[in-house]
């Protein structure tokens, strides 16, 4: 009986800690929004809807709302050339931001994108960005 109670309490505690971590990841939304406005909105627009045929939308983007943020982090670090989004081909180039922005700044931008325009993506930490930056 006590084992079940202890196990239940451990699960509840883990859930609470996870919720606090997620809430803290989105806590710098104003900073993320300011960075997004400065570095991203000219192409992806303030609305996150991009420009059809020129710059892909971030609103509702599979890259933004996936549980695994690796592709999103790599796109910001390394930039992108062309590709398809939502069945639309894009020939434009997204610049790399690895030399321009720090890990916390990239995490703030990604977290802003993950929590804006109706997106419900998983929060990203500066440590995750640093780990991706360190990978070849």
Segments (PLM) and residue ranges:
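N-terminal secretory signal peptides that target proteins for export/translocation
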Residues: 1-6
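Sec-dependent N-terminal signal peptides
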Residues: 7-16
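N-terminal signal peptide c-region/cleavage motif recognized by signal peptidases
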Residues: 17-22
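C-terminal region of N-terminal signal peptides and the immediate post-cleavage residues
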Residues: 23-27
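Periplasmic/extracellular electron-transfer cofactor-ligation site
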Residues: 28-70, 78-88, 115-123
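Flexible coil segments in periplasmic/lumen-exposed cytochrome c-class electron-transfer proteins
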Residues: 84-136
């Amino acid at each position: 009986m006590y084992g079940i109670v202890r196990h239940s309490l451990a699960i509840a505690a883990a859930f609470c800690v996870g919720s606090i971590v997620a809430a803290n990841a989105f806590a710098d939304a104003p900073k993320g929004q300011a960075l997004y406005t400065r570095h991203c909105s000219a192409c992806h627009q303030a609305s996150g809807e991009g420009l059809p045929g020129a710059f892909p939308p971030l609103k509702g983007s599979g890259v933004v709302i996936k549980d695994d943020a690796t592709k999103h982090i790599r796109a910001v670090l390394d930039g992108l050339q062309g590709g398809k989004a939502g069945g639309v081909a894009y020939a434009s180039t997204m610049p790399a931001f690895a030399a321009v922005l720090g890990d916390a700044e990239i995490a703030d931008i990604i977290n802003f994108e993950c929590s804006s325009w109706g997106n419900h993506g998983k929060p990203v930490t500066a440590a995750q960005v640093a780990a991706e930056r360190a990978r070849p």
